[in-house]
Amino acid sequence: MNHNRSTLNELMADISRKDVERLVKRRSPIKEADLTAMNLEKFNFEGAIFTKCKFTGSTFIGSDFAFSRFEECILDDCEMYGSHMQESSFIECDLSKSDLRDCVLIEVNFRQSILHSVDFSGSFIKDSVLLNVKGDLCDFSFTSLSSANFSGAKMHVCDFTACRSGDLKAADADFTGSEFIGAHLDSSLLQGTILNFCNFSEASLQECDLSRARLLSATMNNARLNTSILNEVLLMDAKAGGTELNDVNLDNANLTKADFSKSIFNGSSMNGVLDQDTIYDGAKLEGVIR
């Protein structure tokens, strides 16, 4: 049996869709196969195992990836629109420039994968793991990111506009230069997260833990951060006009040169705050503890 599998792997460059279907149905692991530009539309990958395979330019539109496992695979420039993934794994894979719009991803593991210019817009992503992923220019606009875990991820200049992401976990992640306009991120854990130059205008970050987060030159106009934890946060040179900061912990925060015009700080704790040249024009600071 082992000899037959090794022979199959040597011939994978010429593998057909029917061959893949047969191997997947038999639960046979597929290794080091070249599946470049293959049409795998509406394919049933349930329980499939792929290791170090190349799928560059392949089509997976409407496919079912339930309980499948991909390790060290190249899945770049693939069409995966409208696919369903439940308890699937893409460990140390490269999904750069792939289209995952309007997909359903439940308990999917993308740990340590490369996500350059991946389009997740409009997808439903729940309880999924994106630990230590690396990427930039990704599109998560209008996605649902319920309980997703981005801890340790580096996702620069990505678009999270209007995404809904309650209970997001992203401790020590780096989202430098990303857009979160109108996003709903309530109850998220963002301790030590790098959010420099990000735009949170009109976003909701209520009851979040942003302790030690870095928001250098961030834009937060009309954002809502009520009852959030922002102790030791860096908000230097931030633009936060009209922001709601009721009952917030800002102890030892650095607000130097930030603009909080017409913002509301009622009932907040601001012990040890650095606010040299900070603008509070028209701000409300009733019951603030300093």
Task: Give the label of every model feature segment.
Residues 4-290:
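Tandem repeat scaffolds
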